[in-house]
Amino acid sequence: YKRQGVRLLGELGYTYDSWHYHFQNAAYTELAKSASNTTVVLDHFGSPCGVGSFEGKMQEVMEGWKLDITQMAECENVVVKVGGLAMPVNGFNWHKQEVPPSSDEVAQAHRDYYLHTIDAFGPSRCMFESNFPVDKLSMSYSVYWNAMKKIASEFSDDEQHQLFYGTAAWVYRV
């Protein structure tokens, strides 16, 4: 019944936006495959966890997550909101620091997640997002967006247009 509902969203011209954790990526990919007529929006990268049983295992989590993202990108109906990595659940622990991170620190720590995802999906299927006010626990809004600009500087003007505007305008018809 869940898959029927997601397929119905596509028939009605709606998107299916979902946030979940990295260990749910395979099920999400299967859902996207079963509803190929629906634009499926992955929020927050399919959040790689860095707390609880995943604490201290960021490299191991990232290796599996990269494989999942690469496989998910084969589903042409999936687009990605790239952002939301500053949540405490991601394990960067900036919310525990006395001094918040700089935009350079954020860009450096998150760069591999962004570049891998944008490389797998292409800029036309990725859109920058903010996750405020949740990310405010870790950094200011201006620090976050300055970090995104630094990451985006590695892309052409046309690709930056897609990441900052074009993909979102296309997906949400605005």
Predicted regions and their residues:
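Catalytic pocket-lining loop regions of alpha/beta-barrel enzymes
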Residues: 2-127, 138
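Mid-to-C-terminal alpha-helical segments outside catalytic/metal-binding sites
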Residues: 112-116, 120-127, 135-174
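Active-site glycine-centered loops adjacent to acidic/histidine catalytic or metal-binding residues
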Residues: 131
